[in-house]
Swiss-Prot record:
Gene3D superfamilies: Phosphatidic acid phosphatase type 2/haloperoxidase
Species lineage: Bacteria, Pseudomonadati, Pseudomonadota, Gammaproteobacteria, Enterobacterales
InterPro entries: P_Acid_Pase_2/haloperoxi_sf (IPR036938), P_Acid_Pase_2/haloperoxidase (IPR000326)
Pfam families membership: PAP2
Record-given protein name: Uncharacterized 22.5 kDa protein in cps region
Species name: Klebsiella pneumoniae
SMART domains recorded: acidPPc
Origin: domain of life: Bacteria
Length: 209
């Protein structure tokens, strides 16, 4: 099993442009603009919380040694926030059963991405679980909001839009270029925090003075 490839399904290189494409496609139709703003707000909040947790750790050393916790797993959180909604929207024209299956598939994919982060030793168990719960909370809230929509047609995406949305992640997955988010956050953390260099997992597990 190529766990590096599976992990890439949660990389910012894939998910951020794909999320932007989804927002643009939804904004093209007047009936789905509210949907677009709801989606972007919840996805953006998820990403912001992930970044804040990482900055708090790298800049100020705020982690939990007993849980080997250094911040939310971004791959896990963004996958759980993105893939269920992405697949739900792609299947919006089909039966309720198929839409539910699409959502479940999205959550399963997110869980597999989270597991891949454990296999390649990129995150601890607590970080992956926390990330999955955070992302799932955002996507679940989005789906609950859609149950109240007065116009079911508003979630229907044109076939051209579907084609574009499918192509974007496929092209990005093929690129294999990983986003330098961790190093970028490390630079920001040292710029705004009191430490001379980013706090690390090794630092977390050093004996307290």
């Amino acid at each position: 099993m190529n766990w590096q490839l599976i992990s890439f399904f949660g990389d910012s290189t894939v998910l951020l442009p794909s999320a932007a494409a989804l927002f643009i496609v939804l904004m093209l139709r007047k009936t789905s603009r509210l949907l677009a703003w709801q989606w972007s707000l919840l996805f953006g909040i998820t990403g912001a919380i992930v970044c804040a947790s990482k900055l708090a750790f790298m800049g100020w050393g705020l982690g939990i040694r007993e849980l080997d916790y250094t911040g939310f797993s971004g791959h896990s959180a963004l996958s759980a926030a993105f893939w269920p909604i992405f697949l739900w929207l792609l299947s919006a024209r089909f039966s309720v059963g198929l839409r539910k299956a699409a959502v479940i598939t999205g959550y399963v994919l997110a869980a597999v991405v989270g597991y891949s982060r454990l296999v390649i030793h990129a995150h601890s168990f607590s970080e992956v679980i926390a990330g999955l719960l955070l992302g799932a909370a955002g996507s679940a809230l989005f789906l609950v909001l859609q149950k109240r929509t007065p116009d079911p047609e508003s979630v229907h995406i044109s076939w051209g839009g579907v084609a574009c949305l499918v192509m974007v992640p496929l092209i990005l997955l093929h690129s294999g270029s990983k986003a330098p988010t961790q190093s970028l956050l490390g630079q920001i953390a040292t710029a705004v925090g009191p430490l001379d260099k980013p706090f690390t997992r090794t630092d977390l597990h050093k004996q307290a003075w």
